[in-house]
Amino acid sequence: GVVVTLNQKKTWPELEYEIGLVEPSLILNDGIDYGCRDQLEAAYGPILRPMDSFKDSEPAMDITNTRGHDDLMVLMFTSGTTGRSKAVMLSERNFFTTAGEQVVFGDAMLDYKHTHMPENKNDVLSNFCILPLFHLGTFICLFVWPCKGWALNLSSDLRDFYRDVRLMHSDAMAVAPMLMESIYKDVKRGRRERLNGLWNPCGSSAMFDGKMLAELAREGMMITQVYGMTETCGDGIINYAQDEKHIRSAGKPDDHCEYKIAEDGELCIRGGCVMLGYYKDPAATAEVVDADGWLHTGDLARADEEGYYYITGRKKNLIILASGENVSPEELEKKL
């Protein structure tokens, strides 16, 4: 079977389109009415089941491994910022390519902990997930953290962050810019106890103030940056650098996939992390994955002399000057 994740906060027309596109044989739900329960039951009542309905069931047949590494495994919808959301087709190979990178990430966390917190002998790490399960960032954690014997702490709402992190000690978490700023204020104002031992906030490299990140690193936090997208199954680049010069970087490319910066500055990725394509949309797939297998991310990047990559903007936002020069408004804004 193929797993399809859905965002319950979308409008019914959006969900109706996505469900209709994938034509499911079974829909599992938690029984909560998110504003479209009546429409869901009217349209899909015969295949609608409670989330826990499987616990009393018996398999209809013996389960054998009949799937290939490159067969479709999961469908995840993109945000749809450029129109209707697209269903990204991900395979087993995609997930295990990314899982390999995440295992390296966990080992880097342990190395940091042994060096900077030698008094803490507990090597069972915990990850606080505030992103929903339909988000690839949390979904991939379900593969990696339990396999390592580590804890995954799930929170359902950003507004409950301080309550939940107090109840569930966590070493690491992926953070949005607003939350990183809140963590920074807690540390600078002597309120670090509110974070209950959190020491590895992980961000998306294009969004944060480098000086703020460097200051958090000086205060004893391990700052990591991750670049990835649904179309690469979350794989991309991870930055472990803690110095102010490189801390805002997306990091150095690893050996899990290939990376290049095209002549127009667009970051391209090729390898086992790249999606199978967009479901039922070969034209859209051809627009982003070329004949040589390179995924064109739509993000602009540059690399410094030491091999660190920096995300500088979006290709679609480029301003073309009269001289023919391409200028990224995001990069221009930072200079101003």
Task: Say what each PLM segment does.
Residues 1-26, 86-89, 149-157, 224, ...:
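Short beta-strand->loop structural element characteristic of the AMP-binding/adenylate-forming
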Residues 2-62, 66:
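Structural core segment of the AMP-binding/adenylate-forming
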Residues 58-77, 83-84, 94, 110-126:
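Conserved pre-ATP/AMP-binding loop-to-beta segment of ANL
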Residues 72, 78-81, 127, 132, ...:
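Conserved S/T- and glycine-rich ATP-binding loop of Class I adenylate-forming
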Residues 96-126, 133-197:
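Conserved AMP-binding/adenylation subdomain of ANL enzymes
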Residues 171-175, 184-245, 258:
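Gly/Ser/Thr-rich phosphate-binding loop
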Residues 253-262, 266-321, 326:
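Conserved ATP-binding/catalytic segment of the ANL
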